[in-house]
Curated annotation (Swiss-Prot):
It comes from the Archaea. Keywords: Toxin-antitoxin system. Belongs to the UPF0165 family. Possibly the antitoxin component of a type II toxin-antitoxin (TA) system. Its cognate toxin is VapC17 (Potential). This is Putative antitoxin VapB13. It comes from Archaeoglobus fulgidus (strain ATCC 49558 / DSM 4304 / JCM 9628 / NBRC 100126 / VC-16). It holds the Pfam family AF2212-like. Transmembrane segments: none annotated.
Amino acid sequence: MGEIIEAVYQKGVLKPLRKVSLREGEIVKVEIRETKKVTGRFYAKLRELEKRIERVEGAHRELEEIRDDRY
């Protein structure tokens, strides 16, 4: 079973921020991702999507104007 959890690194030890279902001594693989970097990339993608949405909405308005002018 795999899951993603948040942890804090303190005094050389990764400490989960919530209870995990592991047996004592169980070996796991850990992927380190800095939250700030992930969050920064996420917000950059959101800004990119907002710009795309604005372009689509602008095109939609123009098409409505053309339709209204014709009919």
